């Protein structure tokens, strides 16, 4: 993480809160901004990448740490939007 990354801490929340929180945080940020999501909800492992694809963002999903917290690094506007849905 860099000093400029916006960190969204959704630890302890359940689906759909992690995706809602990262979507809310992304609203006012320009393309190229980086959001780092911390979440321990297992559903976020599929929900966050799906949301990112639909919105045209790139996402890197890290491995869960010993406490079950996964780090998601979302780069806004750096992916291809999924127009199939």
Feature map (PLM): residue ranges:
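Amphipathic, hydrophobic secondary-structure cores in small proteins
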Residues: 10-62
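C-terminal structural segments of small proteins and small subunits
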Residues: 49-85
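Right-handed parallel beta-helix/beta-solenoid
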Residues: 1-9
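A general secondary-structure signal for short beta-strands and their flanking turns/coil
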Residues: 3, 32, 67-69
């Amino acid at each position: 993480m860099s000093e400029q990354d916006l960190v969204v801490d959704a630890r302890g929340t359940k689906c759909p809160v992690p995706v809602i929180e990262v979507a809310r945080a992304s609203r006012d940020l320009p393309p190229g901004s980086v959001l780092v999501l911390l979440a321990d909800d297992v559903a976020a492992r599929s929900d966050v990448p799906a949301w990112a694809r639909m919105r045209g963002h790139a996402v890197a999903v890290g491995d869960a740490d010993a406490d079950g917290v996964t780090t998601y690094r979302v780069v806004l506007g750096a992916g291809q939007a999924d127009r199939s849905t």
